[in-house]
C-alpha cells in the first residue's frame, strides 16, 4: 500500500482505518511470537555438551569440536630430570620359588668354573617373573545317602550340611560372574567364554542370569543399610539419568556421599522420586543441578552445580547483544570462582576462600539483578537470572561448609558407569532385573569409593548367605581398613 492510499483511508473511512490498525497490531504480535520461537529453536539446535547438560556422545554433527590443548613443546615419553619408575622387586618372603643360575664358563677365557668358586660370587642380579598358574575350577560331589530304619522301616536321607551351596556353583564362582557383569560390564556370552577358557567352568546363559539374580537378592540388607546412610548423611550429591526397562522409559537416580553410593530406578524424574530417595526429613546438604524436582529443598541446604552453570553461561555467551555480554561476564566470574576453589583445595585456607568469594558474590548479584529486569528483551537470560536469584544461597554453600564442593561431578562420575552399563545391556527386562541392578551398581560403586575389592566383598556376601550368617555391610571407616 502506498502512502497516498493510506492517507485516503485515514481521511475517508474510519472503520477501515481501525480495522487495519488492529490487523497491524495482530501481525506485530504474531511476528514477535515467531521471532521468539525461531530464537528458541536456534538455541535448541545449537545445544551441545559445551553449553548444556547434553553428554558428549549426543553432540550433533555440526557442533564445534572441543578446543585442543596448545602444544607443550615437550617430546613424548620421559622428560629430562624426571625420576624414572620401575617395577619393584617383591621381598623374598613373598616369592613362591627362587631359582639360582650360575655361569658355566668365563666369557673372556672360557675357564670352566668349579663348585668351590661359586662361594666367592657377588650379590646376584635379580629378575622376577610373575605368572598365572594353570587355573581350573574344583568340582565337589556331595552324596546324600538314604538308609532304611530297621525298627519302623522309614527311609531317611542325609541333608546337605551348612555351608554347602544349594545351587550348582560356589560363592567365589558366583562372585566372579557378578563382578564381570556389573563392574567389568562383560556380556553374558563373553562371560561364558571367559569362564570356560580361563577356569574350565561350563555354564549356560540361564545359569549366568540366575547367579546375578542370586547376588542381587543377597545384597538386599546391605542396600537397605546404604539407603539409611544416605538419608542420615551430612552432604549428598544427587543426579539422575535415563534408563530402560523392557523398552519403556525409566529413570536411574543416584545419591552419593564421599564413601557410599546408592542407586534406585524409578518411573520418572519427578519431585516425589527425589523425596523417596532422600526421605521426607532429610536434614543434610544436597548438591545437584537446577532440575526442578529439587526445588522443594531449602536453598540454604543446597549447593547448585557450578559446572552446569558454566555451561549455561557458555550458552548465553553464544547469543546476541545483551545476552552475549551477560554470558561472557558470567563465564569470567565462574572462572575466578574455580580458581579460588583450586587454591583452597591446595592450601585449605577457608578464610582466604571467603575473601576471594565476597567480590564475586557482589559482581554476580549486580549482573543477575540487571538481567532480571522486565526491560531485558531476551527472556532466556532474564529467566535464568531470576532463577539464580531465587536460589541465591545455594550458589555459595561450598564456600562456608566443609564436605561440600562447588560442582556435582562426584554424582556424575558415579552415574557414568551405570550409563555405560545401560548402553551395553539395553537396561533391564523386568522389575526384578531393576532391583538386581540397583543393588549391584550400589555395591560396585561403593566398593570403588572405599577402595575395596568388589569380588572379595561379593564372595563374603554370598558365603554368608549360603551359611545363613549375617550379611556383611558396606560400612567402612576409612580407605584400606
Spans of features found by a protein language model:
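Short, flexible loop/hinge motifs at secondary-structure junctions
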Residues: 1-168, 238, 244, 288
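Catalytic center-proximal scaffold of phosphoryl-transfer enzymes
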Residues: 11, 39, 86-87, 103, ...
